[in-house]
Amino acid sequence: MTQISQLLKKAEAILFEKGLDQNAAEILLETRMGLSRSELWMEISRELEPNHEKQFEEDFARYLAGEPVQYILKTAPFYGYDFLVTEDVLIPRPETEELVACAEAFLKKHPVKNVLDVCTGSGIIAIALKKAFPEISVTASDISAPALVVARKNALLLNADVRFVETDLLEAFKQNEERFDMIVANPPYISEAEKAEMSDYVLKNEPSLALFAENDGLAIYERFVDNLKYVLNSSFWVGVEIGYTQGERVKQLFEKSYPHTTVVIHKDINSKDRYVTCSNILV
């Protein structure tokens, strides 16, 4: 049998040589063993059980072949929770947590009854908000049926009472004349021109339906903003994640359609434009 320290040393040398994330080996091993990072290091001189060693070898080979750690383990952290992720949904990004935090800050100050999360994917935004504010009604939508399967499983696993609807953006709610006080969205916003700058890990594994949009990445925003008037109450707050080059253009879309509202571009922790909010607060 092999010691944990020996296995990690060998794996990390391979990762270093290939220019890959050297934390990947530890993450794969600790997750499969059900240990925290500190617990793994306390056991560093221990010999691995054959089943754990075999599982690590299989996982490590998949990672070296280009599969993201989150898809291998089928889990990803977001906002203090562990979410199920599959190839049908995007891997949660830390930047999206900042949009959730902004929405939470608004919810703490203003009475809101109905919240809608558009392009929900794995359900991370809707579920995080429902866990923080169990008294509000939360609906989440996506055009992808496979993504909604994952989102429903996450809601069940995390005991979050969220309603899920399969629809193209706001169409179902527009047809049913439903109205919301708050709408959050993390839509596809990457342009085709940006593909050359993207990691192969993303391009080869994550669903393109959730990544790319036409018209320089703005096509989904244009349809979304144009139809908001059919589904918003008179007092509302809208927050959308954006690409770091899209702030002014998305702001202009909101200002053109809703000239008497407050539209703000917010920067992320790296000082890049990351989300835009549009609000009309009457209460």
From Swiss-Prot:
Summarize the protein's role. Methylates the class 1 translation termination release factors RF1/PrfA and RF2/PrfB on the glutamine residue of the universally conserved GGQ motif.
Family per UniProt? Belongs to the protein N5-glutamine methyltransferase family. PrmC subfamily.
InterPro entries recorded: DNA_methylase_N6_adenine_CS, HemK-like, N5-glutamine_MTase, PrmC_N, RF_methyltr_PrmC, SAM-dependent_MTases_sf, Small_mtfrase_dom
Which UniProt keywords are listed? Methyltransferase, S-adenosyl-L-methionine, Transferase
- Give the EC number: 2.1.1.297
Q: Which residues bind S-adenosyl-L-methionine?
A: 142, 186
Q: Which gene encodes it?
A: prmC
The enzyme's first-digit EC class, named in words, is: transferase
Q: How is this protein named in the record?
A: Release factor glutamine methyltransferase
Q: Lineage of the native species?
A: Bacteria, Bacillati, Bacillota, Bacilli, Bacillales
User: One MF term from GO for this chain?
Assistant: protein-glutamine N-methyltransferase activity
Residue sites binding substrate per the record: 186-189
Catalytic activity reads:
L-glutaminyl-[peptide chain release factor] + S-adenosyl-L-methionine = N(5)-methyl-L-glutaminyl-[peptide chain release factor] + S-adenosyl-L-homocysteine + H(+)
A GO term (biological process) for this protein? Answer: translational termination
Any one Pfam family here would be MTS
Per the UniProt entry, what species is this protein from, by scientific name? Listeria monocytogenes serovar 1/2a (strain ATCC BAA-679 / EGD-e)
**PANTHER family hit by this protein:** HEMK METHYLTRANSFERASE (PTHR18895), MTRF1L RELEASE FACTOR GLUTAMINE METHYLTRANSFERASE (PTHR18895:SF74)
